[in-house]
Amino acid sequence: MEKLQLPNGLCVSPVALGAMNFGSTTSKEEAYEVLDTYIDLGGNFIDTSNNYAHWAGTGDESETLLGEYFRDRGNRDKVILATKVGFDRHGKGAGLKKEQIEYWIDESLRKLRTDYIDLYYAHTDDMNTPIEEIMEAFDRLVKKGKVRHLGASNYDTWRLAEANMTAKANGWTEYTVMQQRYSYLHARGEVAPKYTFNEIVDRERLRYLYDKNMPLVSYACLCKGAYEDESRLPEDCIAGARMALVHKMAQEKGLNPSAIAIAWMTNLHRLPGMPRVIPLFSATPAQLRDNLRGVTLTLTDEELELMKNT
């Protein structure tokens, strides 16, 4: 895979690997195989969080397993590593107070067995903490060398703008990447009503990211396997025409449907007013090999327009 140089200077693969279930529902042996396959295929952008996967374990497993992997393989310097802070951990409360940010970065560094995080996300917004306190605390991590770049996840557009305006006015580090739920089936923002507003990218957010030259890392981009198994779609999802088009294109091109969905996202920046999108997903080694075929697929202008207008 050819690498992309992001506006913040990070050089990443065009798709990111999610480590959400590593160490919990995905065993150490399986996770190592996935990581080896992803890196062998040219990937270098690995995403985790300090609370993965609390719904299946304690929430420490993913970072801990990744730290062991980097130790065993000796390849930490070969990857761009992203993790997050903000949700409740071990009853210490959700939030982005400076004490929480400072505590959890050290915990993440320890578990990941690294001296720095390439991309550190605010995993969720904290409306109860002054935005100045949040951005100054993150900036201190950058100045100390613990973090290279900052990102925001699950932020409303106006709050992302407020955070970066505050940082800019004070000479602090700004958010340079947004991570948000986004998929071809959810591309208009109104077709996944089971999710709350701030979890889905809408037109306003896409335009803001384009105007600010901020890439979008799209989580849940393969809808938990729904492109291959439509029973995984929410009952009230109204994206049937798009699903049918994806399957038609997949059959014509000899690809699996998820590869077409990935191609849509990696080609999306070619449309007027659309930001660069980096799909983020978890997969088995076999699924990785199939899905990543979409990265090298260049959609024609006509195909992009057809997909957009369906």
What residue ranges belong to the model's regions?
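Active-site groove signature of glycoside hydrolases
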Residues: 109-130
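Short, acidic/polar
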Residues: 26-38, 96-112, 161-165
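Beta/alpha (TIM)-barrel catalytic core signal, keyed to glycine-rich beta->alpha loops juxtaposed to Asp/Glu
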Residues: 129-310
